[in-house]
Amino acid sequence: LSTISQALTPSPSMILETIQPEIVYAGYDSSKPNTADNLLSTLNRLAGKQMIQVVKWAKVLPGFKNLPLEDQITLIQYSWMCLSSFALSWRSYKHTYPQFLYFPPDLVFNEKKMHHSAMFELCQGMHHILLQFVRLHLTSEEYSIIKVLLLLSTIPKDGLKTQAVFEEMRTNNIKELRKMVTKCPNNFGQSWQSFYQLTKLLDSMHELVSDLLEFCFYTFRESQALKVEFPAMLVEIISDQLPKVESGNAQTLYFHRK
């Protein structure tokens, strides 16, 4: 009976795959010129919609509800940019050729749009992550677990309210990633190397996101002068996150130290 029960019980990776957020649309108006303010405002509106989906996703993550609401909010605030850019690379990997960035179905960035957006170098950074997906032949199972680990990779320097519960959830997901690469037939005899490469990918996301946040905070401060719009959801998140990050209160949990 226990064997049947185990066979019928979905694995953690299967659960994570089934709860992935729906793809949302940017509402991109192709009749407007591709100026930096129009493109950035559209991306901000998209990010606001995506954050609603991220909150819904986080709520049903195994173990996340064991954290107090304050800790849940803190983790989402610290990781939103990481989650958004990682999901962007995944969509680009699945739906386009490697030279494009697939923000939503109605707004795909080619090199021309990257230049027009005033964030060409940042787009190149996101494109580099996409190329890592291609090189690693990233699977949906690996993507799903790494995404959870990104949610759990930045915390306040003085820790969370329930640090022990957080550490247990993070440890469980690290173990699941180890288990997954060990079972993968493509990784036979090389599971340690696959785990190393996947965790290096995870660490590299934080380096990119540091630059993305710097640009985001700048456009947020200068939004009126730059004519860049921010939806209410992002205003709330950034207003709370910005002083914490710039005061050095955010601690990133790396797998590898340089």
Swiss-Prot record:
It is found in: Cytoplasm; Nucleus. The gene is NR3C2. Composed of three domains: a modulating N-terminal domain, a DNA-binding domain and a C-terminal ligand-binding domain. This is Mineralocorticoid receptor. Residues 1-6 are annotated as: Hinge. SMART domains: HOLI. Belongs to the nuclear hormone receptor family. NR3 subfamily. InterPro entries: NHR-like_dom_sf, Nucl_hrmn_rcpt_lig-bd, Nuclear_hormone_rcpt_NR3, Nuclear_hrmn_rcpt.
